[in-house]
């Protein structure tokens, strides 16, 4: 894999449960042009107001964790909070994350809350 200055040098993963087991799910793969990174994912949160991401360098080195707090997220029963995460790159080393509370169907309507955060990806 050839990594020129336009290529993302790290995978961006989210820590989640997959069929009840802890898993590291890839959201953005290394090797793509940074300016082409635009993706989204929906997560069901399990009684938490935090999303845990991992920056996994393709060239080796230490993984870097990122914790995103969702301040003011309404407290709901376990697994009754759905959020949409959208990712885009603002530069070769700056990731923009937008998160939106989707609620949980008719049971728990969306709060309308949104969070945005920019992360600088060291070694990206």
Task: Describe each PLM feature range.
Residues 1-124:
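Acidic low-complexity intrinsically disordered segments
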